[in-house]
């Protein structure tokens, strides 16, 4: 684990002034407990200058889109900010930071070693729809490591009304990654690790504060990964560097992040599509490869992200956000096997399909407060704009056959040299209006919001297509006691409108109105003693495009629907004096409705498990030794309109960390074993008739030096 997360772990500055009476009472109780044991941390632990709940895994303050930093216990949404400590403890060499996000019960991470992909409440998301420092669509599609990330905030459910306008869909929720900034204590950390197979990693994390009152900060995080992974014939080469410069003034804050990443995977991907089978073949050996070793794909990303806030007076703050993200599939060359028989036969088609995009985002607005009588108002007025140019093109290059249970070999083919042409240009302009009204000494809060945007889409060789829509946000919360808050909310999201393509449709070339997703949620947040629990009920209705027959022919329309209904329980805290816990569970009932001719109405959405959950634990044996464990469960799921069933699966990760010194240099040694049982299993992909193969058992060892 990174030593920098422990540098300020017991620094108790600046908490008392902000405490509620209940928190002050907790603090007095904690002080007595600390007198009895050095392991019992204060109610809000400061890790790297950031306050967390007991156990240090979840941060109390969440950066929630345009709302800014808010106490997560007061927000009328399901919001979780995973801390740097949790990210460093539970990220994996195979899936990076995505595996940490599965500590949030609404999130399920895929096992892909190459692609940022998760589901939130049953809806797929990739890097195109994720945020960095509040900038929409800025995350890479490639699987980046955690080294540069300070925290990750997950807002479950559609929430376009409180986030920056995003061209990519954020149906199930939003994920925002915050880059590391220089903290109060300077650090120089060097990390050396063995990631399994023949893969090794070297990293450095350096931060300094300087200038009058340490107002300026600089942080550089860089790493290199190279070597064959735990899967045979698959190799990963990765180079990343992120530079973060910030200024903290008396009336302004500025943050500038610059980033570069290049990731090359050799050996193809991990996914399988499913053909017309009557029985799902048993999962094969996950340590083997089922794609040609000469397949490869390369991701290259560059970022410039600027955030600035200026306090105009005691009640009004102006903000500006800017982002530039250039992304390239550097000669993308990939194939996905398709299962064609019950005996494990498959076909594979490899495509040479390079693509890339350039995204530019600009947002500005005012955030402030005022009072009308006894009612306090906190408002947001914001405007933003997205520009995207996408380049794409290529074609089918090679096809072959194989089997899951025998050794496969495919002769290599020459690679073409091809530059993808411009595919389309898109612009999206949006506005945000939010007013949070506080009554009864802030115990009762009402949030009203309205978001609208207009999209302009121009495909090469076609005329421009425009679409627009608005969506409201309503939320009501009541604090029954200082420790118990209940809320109800309604939120929405919508896409930019779908272009109808295909010669068989009578409305070919038409851009359909934006398809809306609507969520109703009821929840309660309870902070009692050493634990925080969040319970929530939700229903999400998503419009789908389906084929509709009319007297004059076939049309593609937004007349279909998917309905996801569920329950979540999330928790974080401590048991006794040494055991930190974080995790939760979700029940999800995802059904198809309003399908074509009603053929699949009431059937389960492919790949969605009814039950899933994760528990992460750290047991502090003594001040030097800690034991680490995580157990994940994914329930049975149906695919192919309930004609095939994917069995339930368990995954267990175990490890230990040891803090010591080499001379005067603090060193943290971490040993982890992932998928301890070594079980091979299929992982269903929510909303699709496809599968991921589990990651094989692997061992990693890391040493972090605090120089």
Sequence positions of predicted segments:
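Surface-exposed loop/turn segments flanking beta-strands in extracellular/periplasmic regions
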Residues: 273-288, 339-346, 392-422, 506-510, ...
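C-terminal beta-signal and adjacent terminal beta-strands/loops
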Residues: 581, 624, 636-638, 658-707
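Structural signature of Gram-negative outer-membrane beta-barrels, strongest in the C-terminal barrel
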Residues: 357, 376-388, 422-542, 572-574, ...
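Face-selective signature of the C-terminal outer-membrane beta-barrel domain
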Residues: 304-327, 348-461, 535
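Gram-negative outer-membrane beta-barrel transporters
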Residues: 539, 558-641, 677-680, 704-706
């Amino acid at each position: 684990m990174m030593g920098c997360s422990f540098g300020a772990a017991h620094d108790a500055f600046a908490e008392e002034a902000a405490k509620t009476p209940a928190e002050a009472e907790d603090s007095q109780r904690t002080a007595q407990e600390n007198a009895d044991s050095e392991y019992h941390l204060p109610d809000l632990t400061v890790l790297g200058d950031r306050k967390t709940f007991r156990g240090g895994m979840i941060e109390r303050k969440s950066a929630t889109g345009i709302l800014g930093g808010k106490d997560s216990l007061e927000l009328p949404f399901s919001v979780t900010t995973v801390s740097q400590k949790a990210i460093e403890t539970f990220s994996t060499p195979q899936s990076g930071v995505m595996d940490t996000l599965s500590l949030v019960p609404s999130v399920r991470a895929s096992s892909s070693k190459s692609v940022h992909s998760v589901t939130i409440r049953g809806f797929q998301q990739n890097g195109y729809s994720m945020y960095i420092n509040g900038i929409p669509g800025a995350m890479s599609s490639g699987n980046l490591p955690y080294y540069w990330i300070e925290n990750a905030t997950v807002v479950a459910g559609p929430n376009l009304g409180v986030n920056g306008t995003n061209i990519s869909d954020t149906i199930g929720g939003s994920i925002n990654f915050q880059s590391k900034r220089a903290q109060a204590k300077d650090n120089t950390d060097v990390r050396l690790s063995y990631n399994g197979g023949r893969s090794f990693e070297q990293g450095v994390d350096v931060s300094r504060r300087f200038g009058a009152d340490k107002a300026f900060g600089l942080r550089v995080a860089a790493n290199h990964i190279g070597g064959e992974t735990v899967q045979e014939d698959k190799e990963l080469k990765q180079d990343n560097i992120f530079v973060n410069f910030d200024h903290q003034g008396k009336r302004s804050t500025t943050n500038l992040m610059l980033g570069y990443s290049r990731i090359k995977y050799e050996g193809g991907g991990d996914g399988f599509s499913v053909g017309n089978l009557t029985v799902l073949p048993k999962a094969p050996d996950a340590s083997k490869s089922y794609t040609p070793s000469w397949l490869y794909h390369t991701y290259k990303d560059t970022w410039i992200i600027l955030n600035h806030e200026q306090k105009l007076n005691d009640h009004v703050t102006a903000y500006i956000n800017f982002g530039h993200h250039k992304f390239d599939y550097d000669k993308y060359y990939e194939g996905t096997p398709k299962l064609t028989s019950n005996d494990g036969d498959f076909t594979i088609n490899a495509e040479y399909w390079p693509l890339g995009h350039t995204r530019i985002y600009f947002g500005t607005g005012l955030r402030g407060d005022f009072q009308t009588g006894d009612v306090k108002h906190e408002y947001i007025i914001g405007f933003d704009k997205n520009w995207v140019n996408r380049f794409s093109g290529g074609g089918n290059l090679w096809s072959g056959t194989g089997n899951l249970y025998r050794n496969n070999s495919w002769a290599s083919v020459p690679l073409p040299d091809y530059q993808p042409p411009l595919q389309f240009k898109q612009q999206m302009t949006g506005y945000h209006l939010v007013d949070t009204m506080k009554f009864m000494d802030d115990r009762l809060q009402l949030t009203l919001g309205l978001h609208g945007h207009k999209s302009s889409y121009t495909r090469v060789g076609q005329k421009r297509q425009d679409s627009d829509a608005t969506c409201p946000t309503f939320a009501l919360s009541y604090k029954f006691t200082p420790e118990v808050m209940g809320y109800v909310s309604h939120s929405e999201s919508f896409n930019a409108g779908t272009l109808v393509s295909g010669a068989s449709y009578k409305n070919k070339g038409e851009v359909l109105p934006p398809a809306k997703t609507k969520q109703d949620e009821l929840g309660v947040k309870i902070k009692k003693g050493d634990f925080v629990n969040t319970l929530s009920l939700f229903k999400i209705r998503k419009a789908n495009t389906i084929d509709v027959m009319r007297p004059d022919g076939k049309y593609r329309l937004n007349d279909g629907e998917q309905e996801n209904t569920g329950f979540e329980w999330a928790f974080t805290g401590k048991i006794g004096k040494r055991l930190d816990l974080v995790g939760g569970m979700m029940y999800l009932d995802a059904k198809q409705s309003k399908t074509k001719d009603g053929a699949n109405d009431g059937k389960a959405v492919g790949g969605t498990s009814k039950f899933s959950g994760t528990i992460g634990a750290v047991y502090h044996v003594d001040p030097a030794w800690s034991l680490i464990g995580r157990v994940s469960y994914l329930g049975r799921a149906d695919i192919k309109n309930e004609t095939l069933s994917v069995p339930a699966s368990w995954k267990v990760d175990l490890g230990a960390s040891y803090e010591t010194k080499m001379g005067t240099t603090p060193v943290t040694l971490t040993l982890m074993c992932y998928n301890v049982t070594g079980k091979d299993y299929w992982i269903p992909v929510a909303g699709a008739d496809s599968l991921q193969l589990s990651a094989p058992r692997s061992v990693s060892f890391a040493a972090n030096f605090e120089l």
